[in-house]
């Protein structure tokens, strides 16, 4: 699928990506991404035309802030149908989250594809800035490996966010197999395997548990209404 999406891309290029609507990319985040690209000459940033008008503005801004070489390594594709969107998310090597307003459903889609997601809860008091960290923790196994991976992918500051991105992406390498496909090596490849192995048992994708919890909450809400009781219902 990588060849279908990016037929001219060399096999050793690392694909950084974000599939959010473009309004979530505010200036501070975009500057961070440009600095990350500048430190990773064998990388691209994959964004969506979401909306199409945003592409021209971001390209113009990238050229003004970081120069033509970096700006030319930002690649836009059209928004895909849902099934294709989830499938092709695995082509991305590292998803760079938007700290101001995180990926929500998109984060779950990306993690289902087993693509590592780097996030920064920029504002502890804003739920939309903490969401991806919570989703990520829900996708990871409750093991030492899972907890370690969470500490690596949940940054504590802008500087740490950029450093982690450069470290993880810079440590990824590919070698071509006899069948003509690239095989990844490095910490990002290890993270992808952990996400793949863990998603069948993790809480985030345990649909049966979600349904059971919601049904229990509905029953409890009805019971409280009949009894004239109030209060939060915790799932």
For the regions a protein language model found, what residue spans apply to each?
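Conserved catalytic-core segment of nucleotide-activated headgroup transferases in glycan assembly
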Residues: 1-81
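C-terminal amphipathic helix plus adjacent low-complexity
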Residues: 12, 20-22, 48-50, 57-60, ...
């Amino acid at each position: 699928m990588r060849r279908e999406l990016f037929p001219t891309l060399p096999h050793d290029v690392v694909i950084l990506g974000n599939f959010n609507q473009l309004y979530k990319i505010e200036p501070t985040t975009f500057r961070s991404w440009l600095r990350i690209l500048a430190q990773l000459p064998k990388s691209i940033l994959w964004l969506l035309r979401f909306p199409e008008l945003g592409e021209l503005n971001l390209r113009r801004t990238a050229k003004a802030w970081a120069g033509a070489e970096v700006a030319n390594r930002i690649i836009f594709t059209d928004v895909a149908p849902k099934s294709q969107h989830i499938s092709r998310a695995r082509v991305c090597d590292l998803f760079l989250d938007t700290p101001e307003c995180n990926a929500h459903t998109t984060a779950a889609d990306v993690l289902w594809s087993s693509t590592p997601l780097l996030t920064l809860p920029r504002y502890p008091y804003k739920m939309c800035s903490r969401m991806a960290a919570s989703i990520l923790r829900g996708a990871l196994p409750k093991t030492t490996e899972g907890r370690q991976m969470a500490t690596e992918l949940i940054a504590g500051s802008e500087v740490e966010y950029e450093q982690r991105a450069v470290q993880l992406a810079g440590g990824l390498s590919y070698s071509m197999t006899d069948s003509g496909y690239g095989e990844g090596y490095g910490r990002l490849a290890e993270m992808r395997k952990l996400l793949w192995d863990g998603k069948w048992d993790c809480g985030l994708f345990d649909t049966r548990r979600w349904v059971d919890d919601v049904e229990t909450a509905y029953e409890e809400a009805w019971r409280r209404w009949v009894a004239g009781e109030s209060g939060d219902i915790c799932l």
